[in-house]
């Protein structure tokens, strides 16, 4: 269908994998470079495993957005740095957030928090603070086009309530929110 988004796995990307594909079914054993070029020309997102395919498929369920400026909202610094690297390598921008609005947001967070982007509201951050940060990114930070929210559970905040806040904000925010939930296995009522 015209306009649909497609993700695909093409196995046999390594030399050994290509040999294995040839021995099983020769039709699949095309040069990896050719497959990459074909996928790129056709707008197909290449995935290298089932988990990645499922993740990309999930991302496709979110609305398309214009722009390249992403706010990363987190209570865990390490994952935010890794996401910053990954998004930057993919051609997206993680613009520095500063000025009066940023200073104002910082006063609403616990000491030690950072709002420069990534916005890190610490492991002790609350669901209410998460909601406030999302509101600022949605309505006060004009240079932001979308948000990635990383929220897991270091055991210091009620995760169920944080996920409820995140779900509500995803329904009402004007800018898209992409959740990254490393602790969904423990997301039930505490």
Where are these regions (language model features)?
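Hydrophobic, well-structured modules enriched for small/aliphatic residues and gly/pro motifs
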Residues: 1-5, 46
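Extended hydrophobic/aromatic-rich secondary-structure runs
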Residues: 5-11, 15-16, 147, 156
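Peripheral docking tails and interdomain loops at the edges
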Residues: 10-94, 164-190
């Amino acid at each position: 269908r015209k306009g649909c988004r497609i993700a695909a796995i093409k196995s046999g990307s390594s030399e050994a994998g290509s040999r294995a594909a040839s021995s099983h079914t020769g039709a699949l054993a095309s040069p990896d470079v050719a497959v990459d070029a074909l996928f790129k020309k056709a707008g197909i997102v290449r995935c290298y495993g089932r988990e990645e395919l499922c993740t990309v498929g999930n991302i496709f369920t979110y609305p398309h957005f214009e722009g390249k400026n992403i706010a990363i909202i987190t209570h865990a610094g390490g994952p935010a740095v890794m996401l910053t690297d990954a998004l930057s390598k993919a051609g997206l921008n993680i613009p520095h957030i500063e000025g009066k609005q940023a200073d104002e947001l910082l006063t609403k967070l616990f000491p030690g928090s950072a709002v420069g982007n990534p916005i890190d509201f610490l492991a002790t951050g609350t669901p209410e603070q998460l909601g406030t940060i999302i509101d600022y990114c949605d309505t006060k930070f004009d240079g932001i086009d979308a948000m990635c929210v990383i929220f897991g559970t270091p055991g210091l905040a009620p995760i169920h309530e944080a996920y409820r806040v995140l779900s509500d904000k995803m329904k009402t925010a004007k800018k898209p929110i992409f959740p990254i939930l490393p602790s969904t296995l423990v997301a039930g009522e505490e």
